[in-house]
Amino acid sequence: FPYDSWAHRVAVWRFVRDIPLASSHSSMALLKDIGDKLKHFQKHPVTACWGGKDFCFNQQYLRKWNNIFPEMNTHLYSEAGHYVLEDAGEEAIQDIGDALR
């Protein structure tokens, strides 16, 4: 098992703790700054491969991304969760390849 000891789990634990859930979180200012700058990419093609059953990035987040990138090419995999490439790999890989061509 990859997470059989604290030494193997600590990085994941720190990553989760760094997700800003409150405006007072130390990462929130940086995340907001990045979000404010996303509009600079609106003239570029954007493709999203989205899991319809994602427990973390739900439909509310997808709507936000669609508002930022109205021309975004969205592939919604209704049965996929957070790990789209594991749940809908063949289809997602095809869609990503199409976007890159």
Question: Where are the language model's segments positioned?
Answer:
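The alpha/beta-hydrolase serine catalytic core
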Residues: 1-2
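Conserved serine/cysteine hydrolase catalytic core
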Residues: 5-67, 76
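Catalytic active-site module of serine/aspartate enzymes centered on a nucleophile-bearing elbow/loop
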Residues: 70-101
